[in-house]
């Protein structure tokens, strides 16, 4: 939201004038993670909307009728689903009526670099359980919307970024939004505010990234004891993140003295500084995955927080000048001509 709001404030394009933050209110505890942000946005941000969903109840009903799932699955503390039935598509279709009512033509989601994966198992190509968060899904949905005549395109402006670079940009550029972040598998209410549990894998990840970036996890509602516990369990249990991201984060935490690892491999294996750069990858984050007139101002902002920009050439990352690369002006294939052929730099000054 912070990036989109900033971009819309600078744009002279008719297609980038308003941002409509729309929250999907699940009927269960998943809603807790968004509640702090929703209350703030409802009271302070124009165009905020909310759609109520009961999809989580439906998924639970499915699980209760699967004979191979233990009956007490809801009481098992785990960072994993018994079977993943949840899908991003539920939220996307949930907001479509509001998009139609308000005349919104872009459905922007927050998927990052490591959610586009193509893998193979015994000759079977798959998406590592992340298809609904991948660029391929964005494109499939955009094609579907176009075939329906709905004039809606779907994309993410975060695909060139790692989780830690997103957190770095959030904490440095939008600290007021960082205060609203609750990324936790078991968030709970304390008086009028939702707080993270400080025990799950997501909490380890958030505490680790903020600590490595010299930011205060307490800003997101963590207590001192939760921070200490999360960092201790970061070493003991690890996190779920792309391998290079885990390596770089562990390196940064070790270097700043936040953790002590007993794994000698961390002393001999080099870090992965590319994690802190904008990464242009032909499969995961090509230039044309973002509409043309957003690229120039978006990259200008992100370069203020990233360690430069890199482009994948074969198996290596090579420095790239984002604005002079021939592919920078590649057309975005899922929008009609709204008069967006104006040069992005001219649109934003």
Model-found features: residue ranges?
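Nucleotide-activated chemistry modules centered on ATP-dependent adenylation/adenylyltransferase
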Residues: 2-349
């Amino acid at each position: 939201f912070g990036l989109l709001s900033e971009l819309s404030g600078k744009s002279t394009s008719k297609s980038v004038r308003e941002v409509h933050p729309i929250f999907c209110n699940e009927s269960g505890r998943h809603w807790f993670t968004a509640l702090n942000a929703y209350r703030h946005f409802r009271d302070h941000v124009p165009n905020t909307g909310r759609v109520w969903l009961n999809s989580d109840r439906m998924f639970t009903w499915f699980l209760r009728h699967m004979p191979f799932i233990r009956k007490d699955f809801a009481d098992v503390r785990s960072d994993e689903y018994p079977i993943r039935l949840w899908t991003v598509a539920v939220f996307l279709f949930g907001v479509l009526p509001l998009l139609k009512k308000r005349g919104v033509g872009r459905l922007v989601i927050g998927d990052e670099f490591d959610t586009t994966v193509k893998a193979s198992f015994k000759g079977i190509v798959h998406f590592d359980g992340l298809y609904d968060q991948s660029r391929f899904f964005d494109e499939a949905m955009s094609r579907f919307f176009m075939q329906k005549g709905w004039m809606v395109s779907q994309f993410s402006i975060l695909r060139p970024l790692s989780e830690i670079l997103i957190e770095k940009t959030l904490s440095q550029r939008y600290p007021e939004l960082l205060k609203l972040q609750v990324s936790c598998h078991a968030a709970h209410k304390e008086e009028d505010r939702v707080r993270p549990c400080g025990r799950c894998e997501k909490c380890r990840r958030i505490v680790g990234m903020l600590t490595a970036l010299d930011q205060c996890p307490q800003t997101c509602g963590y207590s001192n004891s939760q921070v200490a516990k999360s960092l201790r369990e970061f070493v003991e249990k690890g996190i779920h993140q792309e391998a290079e991201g885990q390596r770089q984060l562990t390196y940064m935490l070790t270097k700043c003295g936040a953790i002590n690892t007993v794994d000698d491999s961390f002393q001999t294996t080099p870090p992965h500084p590319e994690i802190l750069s904008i990464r242009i990858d032909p499969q995961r984050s090509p230039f044309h995955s973002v509409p043309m007139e957003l690229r120039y101002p978006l990259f200008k902002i992100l370069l203020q927080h990233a360690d430069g920009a890199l482009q994948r050439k074969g198996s290596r990352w090579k420095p790239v000048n984002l604005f002079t690369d021939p592919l920078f002006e590649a057309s975005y294939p899922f929008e009609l001509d709204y008069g967006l052929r104006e040069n992005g730099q001219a649109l934003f000054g």
